[in-house]
From Swiss-Prot:
Natural source organism: Aliivibrio fischeri (strain MJ11)
Pathway: Cofactor biosynthesis; riboflavin biosynthesis; 5-amino-6-(D-ribitylamino)uracil from GTP: step 1/4
Record family assignment: Belongs to the GTP cyclohydrolase II family.
UniProt protein name: GTP cyclohydrolase-2
Lineage top rank: taxon: Bacteria
EC numbers, comma separated: 3.5.4.25
Cofactor(s) this protein cannot do without: Zn(2+)
Cofactor: binding details: Binds 1 zinc ion per subunit.
Keywords recorded for this protein, A-Z: GTP-binding, Hydrolase, Metal-binding, Nucleotide-binding, Riboflavin biosynthesis, Zinc
Length: 199
């Protein structure tokens, strides 16, 4: 059974001006160092909090790579939750679960013309190796069983429901199109992601 290990106050966002709390956990199945970032004490004051399960993306979240929209989705969510409250479950699942070095190998294949899924498949991996059981364990540790899920990804919806979390509403993020990621985004849309390119 997972439990909260520590709860630390800090300022987040690109300008480090948004108050939040970062929670660590013990008892997670794989012992990966996943964290929750909580805004406006949403786990204590909201019966159905806004939640995003965000998989780590070093290239996008930290270095603002042109290859994906992960950093923009994260920042959009931080800004949204700074106003309405919510919880980001930051999951150590780099490269849809294949790891950083394998993701960089996949980038090389994408440079040769493959899309993100074809590249992963060429390396011997499935389209998406992530499992969200530990995300459910983190929510359970916070006594949360019903959420509003921020995602465009139907796999996340299905997986978290299968682990006993009720979804009251699905909230989509914007399609963050920029030079270098349009092919990537259209590949995701072709695999079922709900992306609105008109906004």
């Amino acid at each position: 059974m997972a439990n909260v290990r520590a709860r630390i106050e800090l300022m987040v966002g690109q300008k480090s001006n948004i108050p939040a709390e970062m929670l660590s956990f013990e008892g997670l199945e794989t012992e990966k160092e996943h964290v929750a970032v909580v805004f406006n004490q949403a786990d204590k004051h909201q019966s159905t909090p806004l939640v995003r399960m965000h998989s780590e993306c070093l290239t996008g979240d930290v270095f603002h790579s042109s290859r994906c929209d992960c950093g923009e989705q994260l920042e959009e969510t931080i800004n949204r939750m700074s106003e309405s409250g919510g919880i980001i479950l930051y999951l150590r699942q780099e490269g849809r679960g294949i790891g950083l070095y394998n993701k960089l190998d996949a980038y090389e294949l994408q440079s040769q013309g493959m899309n993100t899924y074809e590249a992963n498949n060429h390396l011997g991996f499935g389209d998406d190796l992530r499992d969200f059981k530990e995300a459910a364990q983190m929510l359970e540790a916070l006594n949360i069983s019903k959420i509003k899920l921020v995602t465009n990804n139907p796999k996340k919806i299905e997986d978290i429901k299968n682990y006993g979390i009720e979804i009251d509403e699905v909230v989509n993020t914007l399609a963050h199109v920029k030079q270098g990621n349009e092919h990537y985004l259209h590949s995701k849309a072709a695999h079922g992601h709900k992306l609105n390119f008109d906004k």
